[in-house]
């Protein structure tokens, strides 16, 4: 059986994972909680967790907000799929990403069932833009990320995503293996 099923909270606009102002209303929070409760209650999983992947423009957008979501949902089969890279949306979180990782794992580590592993690069331009890049193309300390995840699960699933070619995936896998001495 699967360790977890990963989804996003969803958006209040045309695109299911899109960025919209209405993603951040109290009504959207209530709909998100109700949706998660309904999915878990109807599926009644015994061995698998239902998880929400954090996104930069929909609930939850911080570790504290994710804890609040866990509390509001109140289901033991609700957990976390961690994509910390989607939360690196400010200069502080970017430049102090190791401290941010520590905060995230301290607060959510016991709930995390799987992780995305990738890298982030701040474009050197006057309009701030973060670009998701292959592992090794940004500034993230991947060893620290893997070490923090392993504290909670030595066999934590780590998933690479959003690359443009098989070659990029293979390069990222080799880079991660070298960095993590696998």
For each of these PLM feature ranges, what is it?
Residues 37, 63-182:
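Histidine-acidic metal/acid-base catalytic patches
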Residues 1-80:
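Active-site acidic/histidine proton-transfer and metal-coordination neighborhood
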């Amino acid at each position: 059986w699967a360790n977890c099923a990963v989804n996003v909270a969803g958006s209040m606009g045309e695109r299911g994972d899109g960025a919209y102002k209405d993603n951040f209303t109290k009504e959207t929070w209530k709909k998100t909680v109700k949706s998660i409760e309904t999915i878990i209650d109807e599926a009644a999983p015994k061995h698998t967790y239902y998880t929400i992947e954090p996104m930069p423009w929909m609930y939850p957008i911080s570790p504290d907000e994710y804890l609040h979501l866990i509390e509001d949902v109140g289901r033991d089969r609700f957990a976390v799929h961690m994509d910390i890279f989607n939360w690196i949306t400010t200069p502080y979180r970017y430049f102090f990403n190791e401290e941010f990782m520590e905060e995230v794992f301290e607060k959510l580590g016991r709930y995390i069932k799987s992780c995305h592993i990738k890298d982030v690069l701040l474009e050197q331009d006057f309009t701030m833009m973060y670009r998701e890049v292959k592992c090794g193309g940004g500034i993230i300390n991947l060893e620290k990320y893997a070490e923090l995840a392993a504290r909670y699960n030595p066999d934590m699933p780590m998933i690479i995503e959003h690359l443009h070619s098989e070659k990029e995936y293979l390069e990222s896998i080799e880079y991660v293996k070298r960095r993590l001495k696998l």
